[in-house]
Amino acid sequence: MTRKLDYPRTFTLGLGFFAISLSWALYNAFVPVFLDNVLADTVLKGTLIGFIMTFDNIAAVTLQPYFGAASDRTWNRYGRRMPYILAGMPLGALFFAVIPLFRSSLASMMTALIAMNLAMAIFRAPTVALMPDITPPALRSKANGVINLMGGLGALLAFFVGSRLYNVNPALPFVFAGLLMIIITLVLKWRIREPEVVEGAGGADL
């Protein structure tokens, strides 16, 4: 019997990628503006802004592999990947939401940016790994298409809504995204059930 992709579950899982794409699109659009203002009279301002904006890339090559590997070895009552999502996404939402509140102080904003990047690193790799964990091997290509669609929708939402909210108040895009991340965390906890044994992982079950 041919197995079919569970589209409702896959779209639900895609909310994690939706949140990631939304938050990073807003981050990359508006954080340089905040930095440009707070570093207005600083020598080598452009270089400093460029360096600060690489924090997520530094986290991507250092922290994300660590948390991804750690989630491979995790299993408890919350699942394998879900503990990292439940811990990281709300923290990421909190620190993301407060970034614009500290935009007049470089030290405070840097603290929020670093904390946000650390929190995002906790759940990003486990979120990516969750799709193949809950999807049969033959259906993973279809599921990946759904996931990428959800990520694209998150980026589009940032593009169409972010600037409008920013024009009302620079903090609104960040608060909006933070609230969505909290809601998405709750939805993922409610709707996604991880299997203890992963089908077809590396040619053998985990």
Question: What residue ranges belong to the model's regions?
Answer:
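Helix-loop junctions on the cytosolic side of multi-pass membrane transporters
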Residues: 188-201
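Glycine-rich segments within core transmembrane alpha-helices of 12-TM secondary carriers
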Residues: 60, 141-166
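Symmetry-related core transmembrane helices of the 12-TM Major Facilitator Superfamily/SLC fold
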Residues: 171-190
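Hydrophobic core of transmembrane alpha-helices in multi-pass small-molecule transporters
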Residues: 18, 92-123
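Central cavity-lining transmembrane alpha-helices of secondary-active solute carriers
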Residues: 49-74
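Structural signature of the two symmetry-related core transmembrane helices
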Residues: 81-97
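Helix-loop boundary and gating motifs at the non-cytosolic
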Residues: 2-57
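Transmembrane alpha-helix termini and helix-breaking/packing motifs in multi-pass membrane transporters
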Residues: 33, 37, 100, 155-173
